[in-house]
Amino acid sequence: MLNFFAAAPKGFEYSLAQELTEFGATEIKESVAGVYFTAPLALAYRITLWTRLASRIVLVIYKGPCESAEQLYNAAYCIDWSAHFSNRNTFSIDFHGTGGFINNTQFGALKIKDAIVDRFRDDGDARPNVARIDADIKIDAHFRNGVITIAMNFSGPSLHQRGYRSTTGEAPLKENLAANMLVRSGWKAAPTTLLDPFCGSGTVLIEAALMAADIAPGLQRSRFGFEHWRRHDKATWHEILEEAKARASLGVKRCDVKFYGSDIDSRLVALAKRNAQNAGVFELIDFKVANALNVEPPAAEGYLITNPPYGERLGSVSELLQLYYQLGDKFKKEFGGWKVAMLCSDIELISALKLKADKQMKMFNGALECAFNLYTLHAQSTRRDTPVLPEGVDIADIAPAFANRIKKNAKQLEKWAKKEGIDSYRLYDADIPEYNVAVDRYLDHIVVQEYMAPASIPEAVTKRRLSDVLLALPAAIGVDPHKITMKTRERQKGTNQYQKLDERKLELITTEYGAKFKLNLTGYLDTGLFLDHRLTRRLVGQKSKGRRVLNLFSYTGSASVHAALGGAKSVTTVDMSNTYLAWAKENFALNDLSGKQYEFVQADCLQWIRDSAHDKSAQYDLIFIDPPTFSNSKRMEDSFDVQRDHVNLLGMLIKLLSPNGEIVFSNNKRKFKMDTDTLVKMKIKVENIDDLTLPMDYKRNPHIHNTWLITHA
């Protein structure tokens, strides 16, 4: 008997142990990401050829305690390597694990390599050569918890590579993962009609057809790890291989299970057909190009097993939620009597199905943790007769309180916005605590920002509520799902607002009281325009005529644009970010503003204020400053806290202010307290002007910001 370890993705251990038991292996023991077992050589060959779940089979040569480099060397040296391979063969070592005396895997691999070549030389043979690529013999070594395991890669390249893929292009679902889906769903135990409406390159259906037609998954592989092993029994292997070929030929002829696959992408369907042809199961599968929402059940009962789209690259969150909701609705209406098994990495999308799972499991698609849910669909005696709203969302079913509130808000604000001369405004701001989001309209686009939920609320609850919000929005306010952008907002920490979210750009031009601004709805947490400061910007513009204006922490320069349009004599725009200064220049260009009177300065604003406060010639008639609540950017010399540091900040700013000048000071700290007593002693006059700067669309959230008018006393 020989000792082996069958490696597999995390979550496969139970299924793999069951498979090995069915093969006839003994001493089966589940471990992390794999299963140990023993088997005679002939059975090991059979397992390697027929396993549908394992990624790799290794022959365990040594396993024992290891507490020093010397012990590691001795463990490898004591093995009779010449019994496993010739010195004419090349070999490589793949070492995993660190700890204790092993600081890095290269050190461990080197020790084992030295032991192997020394053993060959001491036995009177020439040393074998190491080949990092395409070695004849591959040694796998694992060090964990003071135990070293030394093994030989018995199976060769990863077993999920069956050999039927006709391209090395995108293959999001590995073959052994598809096989495990078929096993855990219960389909493999009783094969019946199978449908995959998101078949992609056909992996689930091809793996199922291989099972139903009794075709060994390794039959088309061109290489196995044991081929250069000295104990390889070519005759036994040939016999097992020929038996598998005969079973495959007979199995295809006898297979009476029906397989149906479809995908909306004709290129993927063509690829699926080629893959099925290569796998020898083309005649068993009916492929077609179709939208999953238009696919009809091909039989009265069966299995629908699929890996539907998820992830931002495949569409907006709202679009995907709509898709999943409509799928769930279709399943309930049309697939009574069927079983559904679905793999998805996003709990929000799964919850949008609005189906109760019989069983929920965890699987890994590569490093991506996924939910694998099983559903039993019961035939409905009656169908819902009420009309379905756009995109299949019934507003009465999905978050009715939220839907009704935002619908009411939108109706009230639309007329107001048109009268104001603006096309970007807030529709909803956590009006209902359960739906803890902000919803902003930017022309015909919607941005949803999720606030950080209290720790007391389970994550599953917050995700379900967010899912319901995104599902209800299109019908409630008449917006296309693909024009909804989702963002997650937490309490501002340091430079969070300046962090890039992704490389995509969804850019629009918005209008605000005659000024034009560029928006980027996807690139950053904020869009380039703080909507709550709309009236503050207009106030700056109204106060700017003939004045020297300074805008600090300027962001994208929107207040500077209003100042320039308001007739400012000069405008100086200061920000630490080159990205936002470039954006500010674009905003100036959009408004046909150019000239030497408009200066853009890249600098740490706090340091720039300190330096300028000593320059008596640096005088401004109007200063607008909207500092962050807190900042500790690496590019700034010191941290900044607006509550702690505002007195010192205003004390420096007042030195830059002309005798009749004004400072408009604003910040977003909700519990900010102005230290008026200290400022009065410094001969600084302070007046709160919140009532003048809170727009109608923010009346529901009066503490969104606080604004002050500051002058010389």
From Swiss-Prot:
Listed GO cellular component terms? cytoplasm
Q: Which UniProt keywords apply?
A: Cytoplasm, Methyltransferase, RNA-binding, rRNA processing, S-adenosyl-L-methionine, Transferase
Q: Where in the cell is it found?
A: Cytoplasm
Q: What is its EC number?
A: 2.1.1.173, 2.1.1.264
THUMP domain location is 43-154
> This protein's superkingdom?
Bacteria
Q: Is this entry keyworded S-adenosyl-L-methionine?
A: yes
Q: Which reaction does it catalyse?
A: guanosine(2445) in 23S rRNA + S-adenosyl-L-methionine = N(2)-methylguanosine(2445) in 23S rRNA + S-adenosyl-L-homocysteine + H(+); guanosine(2069) in 23S rRNA + S-adenosyl-L-methionine = N(2)-methylguanosine(2069) in 23S rRNA + S-adenosyl-L-homocysteine + H(+)
Q: Which InterPro entries match?
A: 23SrRNA_methyltr_KL, DNA_methylase_N6_adenine_CS, RlmKL-like_Mtase, RlmKL-like_Mtase_CS, RlmL_1st, SAM-dep_methyl-trfase, SAM-dependent_MTases_sf, THUMP_dom
Molecular function per GO = 23S rRNA (guanine(2445)-N(2))-methyltransferase activity; RNA binding; rRNA (guanine-N7-)-methyltransferase activity
Q: What is its main location?
A: cytoplasm
Record-linked SMART domains: THUMP
Query: What residue stretch is flagged as signal peptide?
Result: none
Q: Which family, according to the similarity comment? A: Belongs to the methyltransferase superfamily. RlmKL family.
Its biological purpose: Specifically methylates the guanine in position 2445 (m2G2445) and the guanine in position 2069 (m7G2069) of 23S rRNA.
- Quote the protein name from its UniProt record: Ribosomal RNA large subunit methyltransferase K/L
Q: Give the organism, scientific name.
A: Shewanella sp. (strain ANA-3)
**Taxonomy-wise, where does this protein's organism fall, top ranks first?**
Bacteria, Pseudomonadati, Pseudomonadota, Gammaproteobacteria, Alteromonadales
